[in-house]
């Protein structure tokens, strides 16, 4: 199970440029988890530095549909988790032969990237003789994006950020939380990368399964509803690196967020985890923002 390809690994799969992205779509679709719709969606994306990333839809039975992770959301979250800076091209399919534009939800989600209007999307319908790339700008010409609200120099999605958060409880935190195996350290590190410029309520999650730590952070949309929660983001990491493990094998989850804020993840995270990982130990740790920045 592979969700990230270096340029040389992509070339071995026959992907040497944007027009070759469909060569990996079957692999992407095979990794989707779609027990509700049974429609396995795959997304293949190319970065400005030549890496190729896969995205898949992930659905959760017995939960509201808004918990669903769209393949395009998975793809961008996968980029963020791997510190990629720029997505340039994307191909999305549910059939392996017909490629279409992202849904409106994902078109809006993608607006958080600085180069969103220039992202090229493969449109391919063999029966109609259509095989071309279209810019996201052409698919969403009158966009509502970060520039409608945020200052011009604001850090956007996939750009470096540090929310300057520390835990409220003065427990010892490892000097390099990115490399340690403590869930509280990894969850705090995730929260510090959280993209929440509108609510200013960053949060992060770390979870453990089989001794491995997975993490993710809240990714906000200017349109609010397309935002991706921190548990969902951590599950992107889990699906991408977990080797096919099931959600009910997760044993521990830690959420780090600020206390008494307008946007809290605790209640929805608890409901979510009660369904997908009922035996996990769920903890919430509060943090606060320092005056570092």
Curated annotation (Swiss-Prot):
Keyword terms of this UniProt record:
Hydrolase, Metal-binding, Zinc
UniProt KW Cell membrane keyword: no
Signal sequence annotation: none
Report the catalytic activity: cytidine + H2O + H(+) = uridine + NH4(+); 2'-deoxycytidine + H2O + H(+) = 2'-deoxyuridine + NH4(+)
Record text on cofactor binding: Binds 1 zinc ion per subunit.
Q: Which residues are involved in binding substrate?
A: 57-59
Q: Name one GO molecular function term.
A: cytidine deaminase activity
Q: A GO BP term, please?
A: cytidine deamination
What residues does the CMP/dCMP-type deaminase domain cover?
16-147, 178-293
Task: Report the enzyme's class at the first EC level.
Answer: hydrolase
Q: What is its EC number?
A: 3.5.4.5
The answer to whether keyword Hydrolase applies is: yes
Q: Which cofactor does it need?
A: Zn(2+)
What is this protein's function?
This enzyme scavenges exogenous and endogenous cytidine and 2'-deoxycytidine for UMP synthesis.
Q: Which family does it belong to?
A: Belongs to the cytidine and deoxycytidylate deaminase family.
Q: What is this protein called?
A: Cytidine deaminase 6
Organism per entry: Arabidopsis thaliana (Mouse-ear cress)
Gene this chain is encoded by: CDA6
